[in-house]
A protein has these predicted regions:
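P-loop/Walker-type NTP enzyme "switch/lid" segment
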Residues: 1-21
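Phosphate/oxyanion-binding active-site loops and adjacent basic polyanion-contact surfaces
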Residues: 2-7, 59-66, 161-166, 170
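Generic alpha-helical secondary structure signal
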Residues: 9, 36-40, 143
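Generic structural signal for well-ordered alpha-helical scaffold segments
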Residues: 11-15, 75, 170, 174
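Conserved catalytic-core segment of NTP-binding enzymes
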Residues: 16, 20-122, 126-127
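C-terminal lobe/tail of nucleotide-utilizing enzymes
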Residues: 80-192
Length: 192
């Protein structure tokens, strides 16, 4: 990883015909903390990366500072013809408090006005409309090793069911597959 081309190796591997011809999308999960691995993943992304943030002011500040810093440090790679992906921000562990709503509004304002960076191009960071609420169903899904959209199809609470939330997120991230996702939603999250 620390070789001169270390940060570009994953990008080069993913451009092999084995990947280009057989996969519509490749999703890579990373720890998120600043690391060479995170930089490799960002440089390998062809369209966008998803950054998750909790609606707590210190977390939001650290997310903006850390994410923007990583992206700004990778700007010189554009001179090598490597475009940087857009950062799509997903709010995770949202709750029903006024403080969380206020924090989310502040984050949205920072992103919409582009106050996160003087170096990154306009629109480099955006905020997804879908929010993942801090609900037990997500913990249950993790503990059971099951996708939450199969565990909770309907809900009586104010926030959407896990199925509707995952459908919204999938449609927002991959609008080209919305019709297929709509079919999955209509079938209660079960593929036909």
């Amino acid at each position: 990883l620390h070789a001169p081309d270390g940060r570009l190796r994953l990008r080069n591997v993913l451009q092999h015909p084995l990947f280009l011809n057989n996969y519509d999308v490749i999703i890579v999960d990373s720890q998120g903390a600043r690391s060479v691995m995170l930089e490799m993943i960002v440089l390998s992304a062809t369209d966008s990366v998803v950054g998750m943030v909790n609606p707590v002011l210190p977390d939001v500040r650290e997310f903006i500072r850390g994410t923007v810093n990583v992206m700004e440090n990778l700007l010189p790679y554009r001179e090598l013809g490597i475009p940087l992906p857009k950062v799509r921000t997903l709010v995770n562990c949202m709750d029903y408090t006024a403080l969380a709503r206020k924090t989310l509004d502040e984050l949205a304002g920072i992103i919409q006005t582009g106050r996160y960076s003087r170096q990154l191009p306009e629109g480099a960071v955006s905020l997804l409309s879908t929010q993942i609420y801090d609900l037990n169903i997500y913990k249950q899904g993790h503990a059971a090793g099951q996708p939450v959209h199969r565990l909770e199809k309907e809900s009586t609470r104010r926030s959407d069911s896990a199925l509707v939330t995952m459908h919204s997120l999938a449609c927002e991230l991959f609008p080209e597959w919305k019709q297929a996702f709509d079919g999955l939603l209509a079938n209660g999250g079960i593929r036909q």
